[in-house]
């Protein structure tokens, strides 16, 4: 247990002289028992169970380690159990069991959620999103089959199962449904028992209140020296440090280490305990010492860590000095409250008693007191009281109502306390509001009878905004948004949202009156918000500083939902609506922003119509984005029509109350805002800074637009419906200041001048005016404006969004405003399914998207008011492409409009009024005037859009008064359109003009029968003949003609170019002839070997010959060819690999790895080095210059946010070309066979047995020389002589391919290799230094480290290829191919070290000789590990590179470069035989039979025919070898032999029979199949290795889409695929296999297996290592999150893990929370995950943060978040569970993570994501 958590420690019980139980019973009988008796008992007993220990550290006696503990289990036995026994009688456990069987627990679950616990809400049945279920109830309820959401609790809430008001149906789970049937009475809880219960409950409550409230006066009480009998002088006091949310962990740790003299580790544990519990004891000593520490801590000056400091931030840490007795009583009180909460759940009568007690106002523990003193408590104490109230008061409705009433009455006080406090909202009593205000009946009761609506807003007004009101308007000061008090005050608005979340069906008079009282308070808030943060246009100079704007928008965002809810409530009740309308009008009249004060009017004339306009110049007078009062009026007005209320009817009532407001005054503030937005677009407000741009962005943003932009448009539509159309348009034109712009004579004066800025601005503003007019007329999908529903409005919004692009589900839901109802998700899904088709995701990286149904594309509106400019551009382009593809007119015509409601019908008149027609006519005239300077094409496009609306409105016949066609004739609209169609300058709008004319013709045809006068003149008829109803066909024909002419023009130009080209060739014939000859020569001879054409009849034979390509052995194919040419990625110079040229290198990345060791084996700490590279080539000198610069930049980089472990072993840099993470280089060299001359066909070589003898002799010779005497290598001629190879030096030299006078290694090459080796060594040092039992750094062998890295890298590549199902012949990526090729070549070249015979051995060569000596001794002389312990491929590589170059003849300058010589083949054969032997030894016939029966019971053995065809001699040898050496067979034989001996001894028979293990042909066939399977990985690795060593490509016979075949791989390696050959006793093969199989270690292993209890000493390396896998995850994410809901932190058994994190490599669950679990890694404290990653993944790990549904890649002090493998039904991730959709495991997404890990790409992915992330401060990943 953590010492600061007061955990249970069992000690002997204290001796008691008398029993308190007897005393209480006697007093009870006498009637003198009082609760004070029990309180005294609790007070007296609790200090006995508190203890502490102090100890000084060995290094520093001043550093004290303190350990405090409260023995909870003992306190329960000795105190709580005594009280329970008094209440329930002598056998309390029996009584409690009977109570449980009665089943009167509760019909409401009421489980209190802990932080991070999973919760479930039903989207179909939940009344609102706050209605949740716990795991147990959810699993037993019908909701698990519905559409549900899952999230994690912040702590403090409770389960709503059983609450009738929380669910529309299925209110009970199976468990709580049963409890409904149980009666509320109890036979066990008699009146006498309940009397005792009442006394005990009262005592418990009084004790807890008394002792948990002593904090403020704690130090003063201590001075009395009398607290619980303690003395001031004794060591009886504690200094207690409290939690606050203002100081950081690091600040508190620093204070503890500096002042309290704690160790850093102890300080971390204290801080973790303070964060968890809310306080911790930091010192136990005398009062004087404790007080001194308290004063020191309080006087400590802590600098603020953030730029914005809060008031609390500047205060000192909160401490107090308490008597130990007081601390003990407090600790026991916390335990008592926890027990009490659980006890109350046991029966209804317990809760009834509790409720009655806390309702007594004279008691110290009444509800009022508990609510008000919450702020004085620390975190744990608060949580205990909250849980007690939930369990005691929220289970029954009556109790809940009582608590809600008391909570409402004290609301203002507790909220003010919360605002001045610094604890999080979840730890405040205010957080109970969600439990109370979301119950509809309680919320409505509180509004009606407690005035809670008014009280909430009054409190908010008083605490949050009153102090910022100047001149009746809000003006927030700078940085107010970041002040804590304002953020905390906003929780009041959340409570208001809960309160109004469910609208009642019917409003009672009390509820209506209470609601109206709240609305008055709301009007007061909206009144001061009207015009807040107003701006005045800056002229002359830029603003000095950016004014505050965020706070106003935050206030709007928090209040917007409430405003929508209030309007929604009012919409359903005509009385409420009428009164609220009058209230709003009164507020508007009283507000003076823009329309207040003296109104100056001025007449304005347009098209012979005059209107009196309000004089207000927005260019010089204040304007504001914030007009909530005007917008609230618009929201209310839209609902009048539903109740047959009209503006005129209500106007009479308001005028009677002296409230008079004309429509033009209503719309004026909104018009000013729209005009200001237009001016901003024209660039007139650019000196007002970014503040204005930010505000305009949020004005249109989805979070704000419902109560901003949408309401503004509705307000203007109201104005358009109430005002005469011409007057309305003149008002709008006047406000945009564009009336002069419409005068023709005014613009004709300017037409001859050059364009200037003012004209451009005016044109831009008029453009904005036209767009606003389009929006006012067209955006009528609003209930109340048109005959549409909310679903229609949502449908329109979705259609317009999907016209931009296909959207994923989350993108679409984010692009739509939040609904107020709890089931808005269901509505959204119903609507989306009617308009779009869901395309499922393809692949791991894609999301599912919705695509708009084809027939709805015609509803696209280019000027949709929620489009940004970018959206508009994208949507228009997409629409044009679609129409072009369908061969329709390429334009974006306006959609059909819904019918207006009666109140808004006058708005349609705008489309036929003279001012409108005058504007349209004028724009078209200017469009036709080539010299007009006052026209832009955008004007024409918008006018055509408006005309389209007008035509379609008349065609719809919704409005009898609409006669657009007739009036348009007066202005010659059709004639102008036809002129536009003929105007070549306006070709871009040709199709739109044609569409408009076509619609006009439809209207004309409709009008013709009814009105003859409407027919056009003769000239018009003539034009109409040409432009008939088939205008679209004519347009298409014209487009095709234009396309044909363009194609002819292109063909003519191409013919001219070809003619010129032929002319040039003929004039330069000689030059082209030379080029052809060169090309012919190059193609004829590709190298030293000339390829001849193969006649058709010989082709078959050629293929057969080609199929036997081998890279090793006597039939080896010798490589001929040229190396590739490259381009240096730094200097871009073309370069080829040449011995005399500049050295080339490729950047590489070295990392420690355990990927292929993660399969279950005994070597848990085994790791290796892996090398990867991207393959891009550069000159060494270019790279060195680049690297030096990168190194310098790294040194200059600030290291503040990086821990010691973040410093990488090697300087990391990125490939200059592809930015791949690198920390080393690999030299690029030419092909290895190029160094050796091709052998002659008739040359002889030393045989395999001579090779074996030579190797054995070399091992002995090297072993005989002591290390310090090894100055020269043994003589080759001497070794040959001792091996019995007489006169074979020439053969030896041919067999090893000795190179005489080899080329010298380039100096840059040597430097490059040294750099690579240094990188490998550094990486290994860093990894091993962090291991607990790490070897000495000096013991790391430098020689084999490169070879071992090469073998591991190739093994990792082979496993990766196997995992992605790629055979060897399949095309390798450039990354893998270049890495393997360059690495193998580098190993081979560096192993051929140059040395002269007269020079002593250099240290590297000596180390190599020592290493080779041990290696050869192990392989050939059986002096170390056995073949069972070898990873044969990792032995093969160092054998290949480390041995042969030790045998260079003495005379001359010579070397051996491994490249596929005969000795290289023998090395391969040796290791092949070793692997074969191991496979035969490990074969278990019974297991193989069982596997075969399970997979394919009736399949035939493929090798059976081969076995039966073998000579009996070889078959007998195989049987003999199997019986003699196979380990399971030997164990079985010994076991049976032992049994036989025992049986014979019992029967007194002494025949001495020997048990013979059966081995038939089918056994041998099974064995060969097993061997082939077990050797597949070794052979694939070997093929890869020798492919790059010899540069002989895989033959075409290798499969490209099927698994690699054993026989083909053997042929490629020069081996005999017929395994029977190796069991011929007349060959050296059998001898070698017998040698491998007869190792003493193997005999010992057999003996140990015969004894089941014996400890195994042999670590068997499997022949075929199992494929590494990540942890298998649950298919359903809810199962995974539930599985960790009860896991406790390893450092604190009482505290559940806050952030359970699963290692996906091994499946271990770790605590991902900082500080509570901090082991040390290399003397640095790190997080549990970082520590685990070093052990489990060799410095890199993959972790799943379960409750956040996040995957973390964790590297060396760095990390990144990647998408988790859990996806919802729409193919999307949900990191943080924000959307809450049910998640299921996506195998494709998990496989992507798996392949990144298997392919060693985690470090690179971390670097890539961190480079791309825009993170200002680096996260401290090492603390994870």
From Swiss-Prot:
Keyword Transmembrane helix applies: no
Pathway: Protein modification; protein ubiquitination
Disulfide bridge map: none
EC number of the protein: 2.3.2.27
Span of zinc fingers (UBR-type): 107-178
A matching Pfam family: PRT6_C
PROSITE patterns: ZF_UBR
UniProt GO BP: protein ubiquitination; ubiquitin-dependent protein catabolic process via the N-end rule pathway
Zinc finger regions, RING-type: 1126-1220
Record's keyword terms, sorted: Metal-binding, Transferase, Ubl conjugation pathway, Zinc, Zinc-finger
GO cellular component: cytoplasm; ubiquitin ligase complex
Enzyme class at the top of the EC tree: transferase
Region (Disordered): 1006-1043, 1073-1093
InterPro entries xrefs: ClpS_core, E3_ELL-like, E3_ligase_UBR-like_C, Ribosomal_bL12_C/ClpS-like, UBR1-like, UBR1-like_winged-helix, WH_DNA-bd_sf, Znf_UBR
Matches recorded under Gene3D superfamilies: 2.10.110.30, 3.30.1390.10, E3 ubiquitin-protein ligase
GO molecular function annotations of the record: ubiquitin protein ligase activity; ubiquitin-protein transferase activity; zinc ion binding
Catalytic activity, as annotated: S-ubiquitinyl-[E2 ubiquitin-conjugating enzyme]-L-cysteine + [acceptor protein]-L-lysine = [E2 ubiquitin-conjugating enzyme]-L-cysteine + N(6)-ubiquitinyl-[acceptor protein]-L-lysine
Matching SUPFAM superfamilies: ClpS-like, Winged helix' DNA-binding domain
Recorded family membership: Belongs to the E3 ubiquitin-protein ligase UBR1-like family.
Function of the molecule: E3 ubiquitin-protein ligase which is a component of the N-end rule pathway. Recognizes and binds to proteins bearing specific N-terminal residues that are destabilizing according to the N-end rule, leading to their ubiquitination and subsequent degradation.
PANTHER family: E3 UBIQUITIN-PROTEIN LIGASE UBR1 (PTHR21497:SF24), UBIQUITIN LIGASE E3 ALPHA-RELATED (PTHR21497)
UniProt name for this protein: E3 ubiquitin-protein ligase UBR1
The organism's taxonomic lineage, starting at the top: Eukaryota, Metazoa, Ecdysozoa, Arthropoda, Hexapoda
Gene name for this UniProt entry: Ubr1
């Amino acid at each position: 247990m953590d010492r600061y958590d007061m955990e249970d420690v069992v000690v002997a019980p204290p001796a008691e002289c008398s029993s308190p139980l007897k005393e209480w019973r006697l007093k009870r009988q006498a009637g003198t028992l009082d609760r004070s008796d029990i309180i005294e008992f609790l007070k007296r007993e609790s200090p006995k169970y508190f203890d502490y220990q102090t100890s000084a550290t060995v290094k520093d006696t001043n550093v004290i380690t303190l350990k405090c503990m409260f023995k909870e289990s003992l306190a329960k036995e000795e105190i709580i159990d005594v009280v329970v026994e008094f209440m329930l009688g002598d056998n309390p456990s029996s009584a409690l069991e009977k109570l449980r069987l009665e089943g009167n627990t509760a019909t409401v679950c009421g489980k209190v959620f802990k932080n991070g616990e999973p919760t479930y809400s039903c989207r179909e049945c939940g009344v609102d999103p706050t209605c949740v279920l716990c795991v147990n109830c959810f699993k037993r309820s019908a909701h698990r089959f519905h559409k549900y959401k899952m999230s994690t609790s912040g702590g403090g809430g409770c389960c709503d199962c059983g609450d009738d008001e929380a669910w529309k149906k299925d209110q009970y789970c199976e468990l709580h449904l049963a409890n409904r049937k149980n009666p509320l009475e109890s036979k066990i809880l008699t009146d006498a028992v309940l009397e005792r219960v009442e006394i005990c409950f009262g005592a418990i409550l009084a004790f807890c209140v008394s002792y948990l409230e002593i904090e403020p006066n704690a130090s003063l009480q201590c001075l009395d020296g009398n607290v619980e009998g303690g003395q001031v002088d004794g060591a009886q006091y504690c200094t207690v440090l409290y939690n606050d949310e203002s100081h950081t962990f690091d600040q508190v740790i620093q204070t503890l280490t500096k002042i309290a003299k704690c160790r850093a580790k102890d300080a971390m544990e204290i801080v973790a305990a303070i964060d968890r519990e809310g306080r911790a004891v930091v010192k136990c000593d005398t009062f004087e010492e404790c007080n001194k520490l308290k004063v020191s801590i309080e006087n400590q000056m802590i600098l603020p860590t953030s730029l914005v400091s809060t008031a609390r931030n500047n205060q000192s840490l909160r401490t107090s000095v308490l008597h130990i007795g007081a601390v003990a009583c407090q600790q026991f009180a916390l335990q008592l409250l926890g027990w009490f909460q659980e006890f109350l759940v046991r029966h209804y009568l317990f809760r009834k008693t509790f409720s009655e007690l806390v309702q007594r106002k004279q008691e110290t523990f009444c509800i009022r007191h508990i609510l008000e003193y919450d702020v004085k408590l620390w975190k744990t104490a608060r949580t205990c009281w909250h849980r007690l109230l939930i369990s005691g008061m929220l289970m029954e409705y009556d109790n809940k109502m009582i608590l809600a009433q008391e909570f409402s009455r004290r609301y203002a006080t507790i909220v003010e306390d919360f605002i001045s406090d610094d604890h999080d909202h979840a730890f405040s009593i205010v957080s109970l509001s969600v439990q109370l205000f979301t119950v509809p009946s309680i919320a409505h009761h509180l509004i009606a009878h407690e005035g809670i609506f008014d009280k909430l807003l009054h409190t908010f007004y008083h605490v949050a905004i009153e102090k910022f009101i100047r001149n009746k308007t809000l003006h927030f000061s700078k940085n107010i948004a970041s002040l804590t008090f304002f953020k905390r005050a906003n929780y009041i608005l959340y409570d208001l949202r809960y309160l109004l979340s469910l609208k009642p069906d019917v409003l009672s008079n009390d509820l209506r009156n209470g609601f109206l009282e709240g609305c008055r308070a709301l009007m007061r808030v909206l009144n001061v918000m009207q015009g807040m943060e107003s701006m005045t246009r800056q002229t002359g100079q830029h603003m000095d500083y950016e004014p505050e704007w965020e706070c106003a928008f935050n206030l709007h965002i928090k209040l917007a939902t409430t405003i929508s809810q209030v309007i929604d409530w009012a919409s359903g009740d005509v009385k409420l609506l009428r009164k609220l309308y009058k209230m709003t009008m009164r507020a508007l009249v009283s507000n003076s922003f823009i329309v207040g004060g003296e109104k100056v009017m001025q007449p304005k004339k347009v098209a012979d119509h005059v209107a009196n306009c309000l004089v207000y110049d927005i260019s010089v007078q204040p304007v504001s984005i914030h007009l909530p009062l005007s917008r609230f009026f618009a929201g209310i007005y839209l609902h009048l029509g539903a109740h047959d209320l009209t503006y005129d009817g209500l106007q009479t009532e308001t005028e009677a109350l002296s409230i008079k407001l004309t429509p033009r005054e209503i719309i004026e503030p909104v018009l000013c805002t729209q005009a200001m937005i237009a001016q901003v677009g024209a660039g007139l407000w650019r000196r007002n800074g970014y503040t204005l741009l930010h505000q305009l962005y949020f004005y249109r943003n989805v979070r704000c637009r419902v109560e901003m932009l949408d309401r503004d448009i509705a307000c203007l539509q109201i104005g358009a419906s109430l005002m005469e159309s011409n007057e309305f348009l003149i008002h709008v034109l006047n406000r945009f200041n564009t009336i002069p712009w419409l005068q023709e004579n005014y613009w004709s004066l300017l037409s001859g001048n050059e364009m200037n800025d003012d004209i451009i601005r005016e044109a831009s503003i008029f453009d904005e005016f036209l767009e606003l007019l389009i929006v006012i007329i067209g955006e009528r999908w609003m209930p109340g404006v048109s005959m549409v529903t909310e679903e229609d409005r949502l449908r329109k919004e979705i259609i317009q969004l999907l016209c931009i692009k296909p959207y994923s589900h989350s993108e679409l839901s984010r692009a739509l405003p939040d609904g107020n109802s709890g089931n808005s998700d269901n509505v959204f899904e119903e609507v989306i399914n009617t308009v779009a088709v869901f395309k499922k995701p393809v692949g791991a990286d894609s999301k599912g998207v919705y695509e708009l149904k084809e027939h709805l594309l015609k509803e696209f509106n280019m000027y949709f008011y929620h489009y940004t400019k970018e959206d508009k551009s994208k949507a228009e382009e997409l629409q044009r492409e679609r129409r072009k593809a369908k061969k329709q007119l390429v334009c974006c015509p306006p959609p059909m409009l819904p019918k207006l409601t009666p109140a808004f019908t006058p708005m349609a008149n705008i489309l036929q009024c003279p001012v409108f027609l005058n504007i349209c006519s004028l724009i078209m005239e200017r469009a036709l005037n080539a010299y007009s300077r006052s026209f832009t094409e955008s004007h024409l496009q918008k006018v055509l859009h408006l005309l389209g609306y007008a035509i379609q409105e008349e065609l719809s016949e919704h409005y009898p008064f609409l006669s657009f066609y007739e009036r348009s004739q007066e202005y010659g609209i059709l004639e102008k359109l036809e002129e536009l169609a003929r105007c070549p300058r306006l070709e871009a709008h040709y199709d739109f003009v044609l569409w408009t004319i076509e619609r006009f013709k439809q209207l004309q045809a409709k009008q013709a029968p009814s009105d003859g006068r409407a027919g056009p003149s003769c000239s018009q008829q003539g034009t109409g003949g040409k432009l008939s109803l088939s205008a679209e066909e004519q347009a298409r024909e014209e487009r095709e003609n234009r396309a044909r002419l363009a194609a002819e023009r292109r063909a003519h130009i191409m013919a001219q170019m070809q003619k010129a080209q032929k002319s040039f060739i003929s004039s330069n014939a000689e030059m082209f002839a030379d080029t052809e000859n060169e090309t012919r020569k190059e193609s004829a001879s590709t190298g030293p070997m000339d390829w001849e054409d193969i006649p058709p009849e010989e082709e078959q034979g050629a293929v057969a010959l080609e199929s036997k390509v081998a890279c090793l052995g006597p039939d080896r194919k010798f490589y001929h060819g040229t190396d590739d040419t490259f381009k240096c990625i730094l200097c871009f110079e073309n370069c080829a690999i040449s011995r005399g040229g500049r050295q080339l290198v490729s950047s590489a990345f070295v990392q420690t790895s355990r990927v292929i060791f993660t399969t279950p084996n005994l070597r848990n700490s085994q790791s290796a080095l892996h090398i990867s590279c991207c393959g891009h080539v550069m000159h060494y000198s270019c790279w060195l210059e680049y690297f030096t610069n990168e190194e310098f930049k790294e040194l200059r980089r600030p290291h503040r946010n990086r821990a010691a472990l973040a410093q990488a072993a090697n300087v990391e840099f990125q490939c200059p070309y592809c930015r791949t993470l690198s920390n080393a280089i690999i030299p690029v060299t030419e092909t290895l066979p190029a160094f050796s001359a091709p052998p002659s066909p008739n040359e002889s070589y030393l045989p395999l047995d001579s090779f074996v003898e030579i190797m054995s002799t070399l091992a002995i010779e090297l072993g005989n020389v002591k290390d310090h005497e090894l100055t020269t290598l043994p003589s080759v001629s001497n070794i040959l002589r001792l091996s019995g190879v007489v006169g074979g030096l020439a053969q030896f030299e041919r067999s090893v391919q000795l190179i005489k006078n080899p080329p010298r290694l380039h100096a840059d090459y040597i430097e490059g290799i040294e750099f690579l080796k240094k990188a490998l060594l550094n990486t290994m040092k860093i990894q091993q230094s962090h291991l607990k039992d790490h070897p000495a750094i000096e013991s790391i062998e430098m020689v084999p480290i490169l070879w071992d890295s090469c073998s591991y890298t190739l093994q990792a590549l082979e496993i990766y290829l196997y995992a992605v199902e790629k055979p060897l012949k399949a095309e390798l990526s450039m990354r893998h191919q270049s890495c393997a090729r360059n690495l193998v070549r580098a190993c081979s070249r560096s192993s051929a070290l140059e040395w002269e015979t007269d020079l002593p051995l250099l240290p590297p060569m000596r180390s190599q000789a020592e290493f080779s000596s041990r290696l050869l001794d192990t392989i050939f002389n059986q002096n170390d590990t056995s073949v069972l312990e070898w990873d044969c491929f990792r032995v093969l590589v160092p054998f290949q590179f480390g041995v042969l170059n030790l045998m260079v003849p003495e005379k001359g300058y010579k070397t051996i470069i491994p490249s596929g010589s005969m000795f290289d083949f023998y090395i391969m054969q040796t290791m092949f035989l070793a692997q074969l032997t191991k496979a035969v030894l490990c074969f278990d016939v019974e297991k193989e039979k069982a596997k075969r029966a399970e997979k394919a019971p009736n399949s035939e053995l493929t090798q059976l025919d081969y076995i039966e065809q073998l000579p009996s001699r070889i078959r007998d040898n195989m049987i003999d070898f199997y019986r003699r050496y196979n380990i399971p067979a030997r164990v079985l034989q010994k076991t049976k032999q032992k049994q036989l001996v025992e049986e014979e001894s019992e029967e007194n028979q002494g025949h001495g029979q020997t048990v013979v293990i059966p081995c038939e042909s089918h056994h041998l066939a099974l064995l060969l199949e097993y061997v082939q399977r077990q050797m597949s990985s070794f052979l694939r690795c070997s093929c890869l290795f020798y492919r790059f060593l010899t540069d002989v490509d895989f033959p075409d016979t290798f499969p490209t889409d099927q698994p690699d075949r054993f026989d083909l791989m053997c042929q490629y390696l020069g081996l005999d695929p017929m395994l029977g050959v190796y069991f011929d006793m007349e060959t050296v093969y059998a001898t070698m296999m017998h040698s491998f199989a007869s190792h003493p270690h193997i005999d010992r292993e057999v003996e140990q297996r015969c004894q089941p209890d014996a400890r195994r000493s042999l670590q068997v390396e499997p022949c075929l290592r199992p494929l590494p896998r990540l942890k298998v995850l649950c298919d359903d994410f809810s199962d995974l999150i539930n599985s960790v809901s009860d896991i406790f932190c390893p450092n604190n058994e009482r505290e559940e893990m806050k952030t359970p994190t699963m290692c996906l490599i091994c499946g271990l669950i770790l605590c991902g929370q900082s500080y509570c679990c901090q082991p040390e890694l290399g003397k640095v404290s790190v997080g549990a995950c970082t520590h685990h990653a070093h052990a489990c993944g060799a410095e890199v790990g993959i972790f799943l943060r379960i409750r956040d549904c996040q995957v973390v890649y964790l590297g060396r002090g760095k990390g990144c978040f990647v998408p988790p493998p859990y996806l919802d039904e729409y193919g999307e991730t949900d990191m943080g569970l924000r959307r809450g959709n049910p998640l299921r495991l996506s195998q494709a997404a998990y496989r992507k993570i798996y392949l990144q890990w298997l392919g060693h790409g985690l470090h690179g992915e971390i670097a890539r994501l961190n480079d791309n992330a825009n993170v200002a401060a680096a996260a401290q990943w090492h603390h994870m």
